Structures are given as structure tokens and as C-alpha cells.
Amino acid sequence: MNEKYAALKSNVSMLGHLLGNTIRDAHGEELLAKVETIRKLSKTARAGSDEDRNALIEEIKSLPDDQLTPVARAFSQFLNLTNMAEQYHTISRHCEAHVCEPDAISTLFSKLSQSNVSKLDTAQAVRELNIELVLTAHPTEIARRTMINKLVKINECLSKLELGDISFSERDKTERRLEQLIAQAWHSDVIRQERPTPLDEAKWGFAVVENSLWQGIPEFLREFDQRLEGHLGEGLPIDARPVHMSSWMGGDRDGNPFVTHKITREVMLLSRWKAADLYLKDINELISELSMVKCTDEVRELAGDQHEPYRAILKQLRTLLGDTLESLDAQMKGELAPNKVILTDADQLWNPLYACYQSLHACGMGIIADGSLLDTLRRVKAFGAHLVRLDIRQESTRHSDVLSELTRYLGIGDYDQWSEQDKISFLVNELSSKRPLLPRKWEPSPEVQEVIDTCKVVAEQSKEALGSYVISMARTASDVLAVHLLLQEAGCPFRMDVCPLFETLDDLNRSKEVMEQLFSIDWYRGFIQNHQMVMIGYSDSAKDAGVMSAGWAQYSAMEALVEVCEKESIELTLFHGRGGTIGRGGAPAHAALLSQPPKSLKGGLRVTEQGEMIRFKLGLPEVAVNSFNLYASAILEANLLPPPEPKQEWRDLMEVLSEVSCEAYRNVVRGEKDFVPYFRAATPELELGKLPLGSRPAKRNPNGGVESLRAIPWIFSWSQNRLVLPAWLGAGEAIQYSIDKGHQALLEEMCREWPFFSTRLGMLEMVYTKCNPQMSEYYDQRLTDKSLWPLGERLRNQLQADIKAVLNVENNDHLMERDPWGSESIRLRNIYVDPLNMLQAELLFRTRQQEETSPELEEALMVTIAGIAAGMRNTG
């Protein structure tokens, strides 16, 4: 094996060895020997030995039921540890240049200088920089909070062991600590026994903030400030807020009946409690640090005649935060809160802390001011009094149901049956009216009451506590106006961003038309104050039309929305609903952002970060700093050095690719009569529905086919059996079609000169590398009826043909040539993922033979699902 990744390899083998010790202690030498045999066979089978592959299959088939779980857990833990070693490697001092992101910000600044971008323009772009990451729960984030805390500690140990001057006894102590942590992880329950509640999911999100972002954001801003100072001669203004966090956990009720208005209220209280708790730790640290006496008159006035003025001010804040925790505790328990002043607004912290900061600078103690105090000030700007801003998300028909029920009660007809024009007239009329619309004696159905109650919870909060109100499956202008009306009726005292989410192919194509219609309404134009947010859906459009077609529809919609908002002088923020997978838009962030249409990042970036991707991108402070550097540099680059406008012939060819790929995709998914039975038999789709993975059901409609499946289980199921079908189906076929029609040279030009197109192909390469046709065939043979085998065979042949077509256009000999680290990292994990796949196929075979699944087999199955998800990385 090449020397390139020696440090990583040695960490992987050390962690593997320690895990082996744990397995031996827990289950004896015999089981460890079995795990080792399977691992070695997997390695040689991967290298091409058919004999060893057959031996591996037999070895797994012969495992007794009671060994399935420990063997599955062994490989699952191997993968978790490999992922951690790899994540650590990207921030370690041994990291190779092509692995560690080179310093993205400095690289960008030298690019800007070479392109003669003025410092004035750069400074302006920095002032406007806005990165908002929206944390969303994710059924496939199988790692529990318990495990996440252990991951952070394991990283600390790896970091210690890397120090050159570590003493022998210190090394010994650290290795023992590592072994303890690995043993703790082994003996903890990896998998949740019950479905997490929306409250559990929110707590998971807060744990990420506490363990990583609380340190990571000020750390990033400190580095960013130094880079700016070096390049522009001026740093980041103290009150700048380039990064902030929002969340859907506890606010996203689309298709999730468990997220009620009560849950939303509770999550918002918890969020404020967590913020106060974290600030209190900061303030206590500052009390111990700021023992200085000299101060300005302003601070003297705030502190009174205390000898240590800074401490006096900080102690007042300590009391404020203590009272806040007490009051929120009482509210969460449903008790009467004590009547004390509590934290409701970030300025209550900012003003006194900023006064201390200015005073220290004025008195010649700038070096002290720029330490922990500056970090706390940056946190106050980034996290506010609420830690994260909560979005509300609801499906469009839930709002029209309210209005239908209401209009029927009022005797003026059925809102749902009206034409779009009549709906708009009614809504605008009511929005402009001074009298309330909801009658006092009206008793709505429970579903309608729930929507009204949610709007009331929104109206009780402060504007700072909330992000936007997202309408999923938005199709028309009336969908947006309806929400504005319901919020107005609930007495909402501020203007909340109401954000339509366009997610199917048709809705994306019509998004411009819908927004034009809204902007032509005088009431609406006046109300939005020239600011509009629109969300682009990635997952449902890909499930509807395949990745190539969906990707082009998303690009075209963004372009059209930028154009219409520019014409109307409206500031547009595009909100991207991209998940971790390729089928759901998950290209590596930097590449994905630079492949968007020109001007689409002018209003900043707002993007959802999901469960398992939160852990990979933001799970450790140093990793989060890297991610923010990439986001910041990509946004600045996109705004200061915009990508080229696509040539007309590129667009024309993209239209063809889109049409051909959509047809090829739908011919299989909708046209093949055997497709649904094949999907159900060859993947763990049915079993996934039973697992306690997320708080929301896997289906919108329990009886429907593929179209009723949520996008996440749809993609997740296919990544489990390694065919990863939704992430490539249709794309390669369309490329081959265009080559056959004589467009090879044009495709090659697009690949060289158009970031949008080259990113698409790069994503396809990564998917192809993760596919394993041989494994998918094994699932077919073990699990599906013989009559379905030809369909699986056709799909695998198509996959091989598609790979050839993409490599042909890129002029590459093999996949991921330009990303050796990415390819190495997939290779490293395959040795552990393959046995898990075989175990899973075996478990599916055994459980499907039984009337009643034994808990033992069910647990083993869940472990394989978690392990394969960890091994495939961007899973769902």
C-alpha cells in the first residue's frame, strides 16, 4: 500500500487492534477469530479472488443466529472508528496536502489578487457574507448522542498520541483511555430501542452545538479575522455575523404527526435554556479571568463602586442567566415562573460585554479583550438568546384545509374548489381587512385546530427566535398568501419570512411564474419589504425525475428566480434543501456552490445540513472550522468571480440530456411492471419502515407505491444493497444518447468549462465508485424471486454502460482519477462494508422465512443497516 496515508493507516490499525481486544474480552477468542477470518476473506475477495468470495459467503451463511449481532457490531464499529480516524486525519498535522483542504480563504485571496478584484469589492462582499446552516433531524443518523460524545473524546486521544514529545507514561495512559472509550462504545447500545421523539431529535441538535459549534464558530471567526487583516488591512467587525444556525428539529411537521404545537413550544423553551446554560459557563470563565481594576467611565457607571468593575458586571450577568434557567425550568415543567428579569434578547448580554471589551481596549488591555471575551461576543452574535432559530415547515394542503373548513362554516362555498384567481382575491381582501376572520364560536376539526395553534405559538415568540415558515409542496401564489393570512389571524406581531418550497419537476419549472404572480400583488409587495426567500427541493425532484433532469430543473429554477427578483429589485435568498446523498443534491459543498448559476449566492447561503452529514461536516470543532472556511470561500468566490453564463448550445444540450434521462428514469421506476416488487424484495425497504430510526413515518401514504415513499427511505434502501439506483439512473444513458447523436466534442467542452456540468459528472463518478454490482446481484439471488432476476441484470448492465459513457466524456481511464483521496477513503471502508452487506442479505433471508421475527435477528439487522450507512457515508 502506498506510503501516502501511512499516519491514517496506522491509526486505523491501532483502533482496529483495540476494538479486537474489546471483542475478545466481551465474547471470547473464538468470536474474534471468526471476525478476523471474515475480514481477511473480505480483503482478498475485494482484491479479486472468487474462491475467497465464495468462502466468505459460506462463512457468513454458516453463522448461528446468536453470533450474527456481535459479528455485525464488530464491522459496524470498525467502520465508525475508520470514519473517525479519517475525519481526524483531515485535521491532523500528518495530513497530506491533497487531503487537507488547503487553506481555502488564503487560496481565494490570492485568486482575487490575480484577477484584479479590488479590496473595496472584497470588503463589501465580506460585509454581506451570510452563511446560515439549518440543522435537520435525519432518520438515518443512527449514531445516538451517547456515541457522539465518545467520538469527540476519541479524537482528543488521537490528537494527544500525535505529539512528538509525548512521554512514555503519557502515551501509555492515553492508549488505555482510548481502549476504555472503545470498550464503552462497544458495550453501549448503538441503536435506539424506540423511535426518537421530536424532542430527542432537538436535543441531538443541541448536543452538536454544545460539543462542536460553540467552539468552532468563534474559532473560525478568529482565523477569518486574521486572514482579512492580512489581505485587506482590516479585520472582521466585532458585530459581524457571517455565520448563524437555524433548525428544523421540533419545527418540521411536514408528514410528521408527532410534531405538534406543544412540541414546538417545548423545543423553543429548551433551546433558550441550553443557550443560557452555555452562556453561564462562558460568564463564569470570564469572571475568573477579568480581575482587572482599570476601566472607562462607562464601565464604572455600570459596575457601581465595586473594586473589580469587570467582575461586578459579569456577576450581574451571572444572576440574569441563573434566573433565566430557573424561569425556563419552571415553564418546561408547566409551573408558574418566578417573576424575575430573564434573558429574552441578545442585547442584554451584548451591551454590558461590549462595554467591557471597549473599556479594556481603551485602558491598554486589548490583548485581554481579544481573548475569551471576544469569543463570547462572537457567540452572542451567532447564537443570540435562542441558540438556534427555529423554522416551521408544513405541507401546503394543510393550510388550504383550514380555509376550506372555514369558508364552508361561513357559508361562502368551499375554498378548495375555487379557481386560483378567486382564492387570491379572497386572501388579499382578508389580508387587507381590519376585522378578524376566524369566528369565535367556530369549532374546527382537530387537524385544522393544530395548524391554527401552531400559528399562535409563532405569534407568541420574538422574531429573533424564528427562522422562516417553509411551505412544502408549494405550487401556487395562494399557497404563500394563505400562510400570511393564518399568521395574521393568529396575531403575529412581526413579518415572518414565508418561504415556498418547490420540489417536484413541474413545480420547479413553474416557480418563476408563481413568484411573478405574487410580486404583482400590491399588498404582497408592500408587506415583504423587498426581501424574499425561496426554497429549492432536491430530494423529491430527484425521486420524481432522476438526478440529471432534477439537477437541470434546479439550476434553471434558480436562474429564473434570480432574474425575476433582480428585475423587481427584490433581495432573494435561495434556501437549499440538499441532503447527504447524491440523489438528494449532496455534492461536496465547495464544488456544489460554485456550480450554481451566477448571482444565486448574492443573498447569502441558507442550506439544510442533515443528521449524518452534520456529524461529518460539523461534528468536531476543527472539522467545523474547515467546513465554514469552505463555505465562506465558495460564497465569496461565487459572488466576486462568478462562474460563466452557460452558452446557448450548452443549454440546448442540457435540455436534451434532461429530457432523455427523465424518460429513461421513469421508464424503469414507473414503466417496469416488476419494478416495485423488485425494489421491495431486493432492498430492506419494508424492514426499514419498522426500525426506530426517525420520529417521522417512512411513508406519506401507507398504501401507495414508490411515489408515496419519502425521498429519504427511497434513497436509503437503494444505498443499502449497493445498487444506489436513484443516484445514477438515467444520467449515463442520456450522455450516451448525446454521444451517439454526435455531441461528444460539445460534452467535453461543457465538462472542461462549465462547473455545473463537471460537478454533475464528478458526483456520478463518486456514486459509481460506491456501487457494487456484484453485491447487488448477491442480494437478488438470495432474496428475490427468479422471475425478477432479469430486471436486476438489466439495471447492472446499464450501470456498467453508464460508467463507460461518463469516463469517455471526461477522458479518464478510471473513476475518481482526480480525487485520489476520495477514492482511497471509499476503498478503505469497502473491506468492512462488504461483509455487512452479506450479513444483511443473510438476515433478510432468515427474517423473511419467519412468521414472527426474533428480536435477536431484528437487532442484528438494525446493526447492519447502521453499519452500511456509516460505510457509505452520504446515505440518505
Curated annotation (Swiss-Prot):
Its cofactor is Mg(2+). It catalyses: oxaloacetate + phosphate = phosphoenolpyruvate + hydrogencarbonate. One of its GO terms (cellular component) is cytosol. It is an enzyme of class 4 (lyase). It comes from the Bacteria. Its EC number is 4.1.1.31. Coiled coil: none annotated. Gene3D superfamilies: Phosphoenolpyruvate/pyruvate domain. One of its GO terms (biological process) is oxaloacetate metabolic process. GO terms for molecular function: magnesium ion binding; phosphoenolpyruvate carboxylase activity. Keywords: Carbon dioxide fixation, Lyase, Magnesium. Belongs to the PEPCase type 1 family. Forms oxaloacetate, a four-carbon dicarboxylic acid source for the tricarboxylic acid cycle. This is Phosphoenolpyruvate carboxylase. It comes from Aliivibrio fischeri (strain ATCC 700601 / ES114).
